[in-house]
């Protein structure tokens, strides 16, 4: 019995070591490549294995205790048998002592039978646990094989996710650089404000000193007038005395004395006046020299121009700052929502049972592979959006410039040539009342991103990047780590576009038939232009990359493509003109005139699905 018990314990330990080694070799490279859901599942399996190991160890310890107890009872039985033999040889017949020994022997036999029965029960339990361990080991090996089968696909998917995360990190760094530039511009504006305040203070001080000196001059003039009045009074009194004196000698004497006194008074007055004038001139020269040394000479016209330029710069910077703050607030809110969704998914996954987690992990692995294929399919559109944002971010530091026209090549198919892009739409930001227009005329101010159809960075682009085309798959940048269930929730399914089939009568009374997918329709066709319209009343739509083609009896007349980022507001329209009216709008087709007869058919395509017709328009009469 003891030999069997220890042998079974050794084999069980070897089995555990083998399982542990298989686990280590099977999951050694998996932990780094699996999602957090796989890590949680693996941890729970490891805990269950450790718990089963501990239970088997306890059972083996109990078995060893029973074996030791059986050995002890066997030794005690031998001792009792020996004593009984001695007593039997020494005494004859049965007595009280013999009955006691018989009772002890019977009790020992019962204990031995109970021990044997317990041993058998433990053997059965060990056999049952061994079957359970084999079943669990089989499930675990199946899971390891399934994970190994998808490991290469996971590596490729992780590389793609790493690239997307790197691009997102690059955009975040560029956003931080723009924020630093905004802070620097604020600091420079504060310095300009301080300099203006200092100059104003100096001007006020000079005006105060001037007023004070003017008061001093008025004081001196009043004192001089008072002295003149007193002197005139004295002279008149002396003249009265002279007239009363009739002696010629006295008159001559007083005349000479009076003339001498007048000369002295005049000399003293002139000396005092010259001294005061010199003091005032010296003081004013000194003040002027001090002002010239402390501040540069300011031209009034130049000062007005610089003040107007500074005000324009401050207004533009404030508008850009408001747009960037609005966009940052919207992105922070989106990140918080995505984080909450991810935490809720992780919490739900952590509550699932072990078998359900294994099944869910397999389903999620399959779903992840499918979703990564979808991400690969959407990679072209995502790269286009990333390039668009890169252009916008690179153009965020463009300074004030004057622009007349902005030529750009528009690729056209069929029998068309090159075109020139001239923006016709005007965007107005409500936060700063600053318009960014691409109309072919002289314009000043801050242009963000060059000629991009008048789209401003900030609230405008922030709304597009989240609620527009990027909202369908832009969240893949946040799929780094976490459970596969979180990946499936963040990479949202693209909702199928709604099909519209309309018949009606236009303003001229002609019947038409229009069909389109989504919210962009061909609204009107005239000999001068083709009009596209966003029929949605609440959502803005990106029409960048859309291509319009016109056919006559099945033959291509011409085509034009919107090859710049263009966001249409709700109920907004954009027109494509013919070659003679290309200066009237931003886009044109290289044709003399558009055909709006019943033989013509106008179609629209998207750049993500260039061969799928998104809309068509025909006249019925």
Swiss-Prot record:
Major location category of this protein: cytoplasm
Pfam family, one: Filament
LTD domain segment(s): 508-621
Segments of this protein annotated with the region Linker 1: 88-100
Region (Coil 1A): 56-87
SMART domains: Filament (SM01391)
One GO CC term, this protein: intermediate filament
Subcellular location: Cytoplasm
Location of region: Coil 1B: 101-238
InterPro entries in the record: IF_rod_dom, Lamin_tail_dom, Lamin_tail_dom_sf
Function per UniProt: Cytoplasmic intermediate filaments provide mechanical strength to cells.
Name by which UniProt lists this protein: Intermediate filament protein ifc-2
Species, as recorded: Caenorhabditis briggsae
Organismal lineage: Eukaryota, Metazoa, Ecdysozoa, Nematoda, Chromadorea
């Amino acid at each position: 019995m003891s030999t069997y018990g220890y042998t079974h314990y050794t084999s069980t330990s070897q089995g555990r070591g083998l399982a542990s080694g298989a686990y280590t070799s099977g999951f050694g490279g998996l932990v780094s490549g699996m999602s957090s859901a796989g890590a949680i599942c693996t941890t729970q399996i490891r805990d269950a294995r450790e718990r089963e190991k501990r239970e088997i160890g306890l059972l083996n310890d109990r078995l060893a205790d029973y074996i030791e107890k059986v050995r002890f009872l066997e030794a005690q039985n031998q001792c009792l048998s020996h004593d009984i033999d001695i007593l039997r040889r020494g005494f004859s017949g049965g007595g009280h002592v013999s009955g006691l020994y018989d009772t002890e022997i019977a009790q020992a036999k019962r204990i031995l039978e109970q021990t044997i029965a317990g041993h058998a029960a433990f053997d059965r339990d060990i056999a049952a646990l061994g079957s359970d361990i084999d079943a669990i080991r089989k499930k675990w090996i199946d899971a390891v094989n399934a994970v190994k089968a998808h490991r290469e696909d996971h590596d490729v998917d992780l590389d793609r996710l790493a690239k997307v995360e790197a691009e997102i990190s690059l955009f975040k760094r560029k956003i931080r650089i723009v924020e630093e530039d905004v802070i620097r511009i604020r600091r420079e504006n504060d310095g300009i404000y301080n300099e203006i305040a200092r100059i104003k203070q100096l001007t006020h001080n000079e005006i105060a000193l001037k007023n004070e000196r003017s008061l001093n001059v008025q004081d001196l003039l009043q004192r001089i007038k008072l002295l003149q009045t007193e002197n005139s009074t004295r002279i008149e009194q002396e003249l009265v005395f002279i007239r009363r004196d009739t002696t010629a000698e006295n008159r001559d004497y007083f005349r000479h004395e009076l003339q001498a006194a007048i000369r002295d008074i005049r000399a003293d007055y002139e000396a005092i006046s010259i001294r005061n004038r010199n003091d005032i001139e010296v003081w004013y020269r000194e003040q002027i020299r001090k002002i010239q040394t402390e501040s540069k000479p300011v031209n009034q016209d130049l000062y007005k121009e610089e003040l107007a330029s500074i005000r324009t710069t401050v207004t533009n910077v404030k508008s850009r700052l408001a747009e960037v703050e609005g966009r940052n607030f919207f992105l922070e809110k989106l990140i918080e929502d995505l984080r909450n969704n991810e935490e809720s998914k992780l919490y739900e996954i952590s509550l699932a049972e072990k078998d359900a987690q294994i099944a869910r992990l397999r389903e999620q692995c399959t779903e992840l592979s499918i979703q990564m294929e979808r991400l690969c399919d959407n990679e072209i559109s995502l790269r286009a959006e990333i390039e668009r944002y890169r252009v916008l971010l690179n153009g965020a530091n463009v300074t004030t410039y004057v622009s007349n026209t902005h030529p750009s090549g528009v690729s056209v198919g069929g029998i068309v040539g090159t075109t020139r892009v001239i923006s016709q739409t005007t965007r107005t930001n409500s936060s700063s009342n600053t318009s960014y227009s691409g109309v072919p005329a002289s314009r000043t101010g801050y242009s963000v991103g060059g000629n991009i159809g008048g789209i401003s960075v900030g609230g405008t682009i922030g709304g597009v990047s989240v609620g527009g085309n990027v909202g369908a798959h832009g969240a893949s940048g946040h799929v780094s780590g976490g459970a596969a269930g979180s990946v499936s929730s963040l990479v949202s399914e693209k909702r199928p576009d709604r099909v519209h089939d309309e018949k009606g009568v236009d303003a001229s009374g002609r019947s038409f038939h229009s069909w389109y997918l989504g919210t962009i329709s061909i609204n009107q066709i005239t000999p001068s232009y083709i009009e596209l319209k966003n029929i949605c009343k609440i959502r803005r739509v990106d029409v960048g990359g859309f291509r319009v083609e016109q056919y006559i009896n099945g033959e291509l007349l011409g085509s034009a493509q919107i090859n710049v980022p263009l966001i249409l507001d709700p109920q907004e329209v954009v027109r494509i003109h013919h070659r003679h009216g290309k200066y009237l709008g931003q886009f044109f087709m290289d044709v003399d005139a558009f055909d709006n007869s019943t033989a013509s058919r106008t179609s629209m395509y998207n750049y993500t699905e260039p061969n799928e017709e998104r809309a068509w328009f025909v006249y019925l009469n």
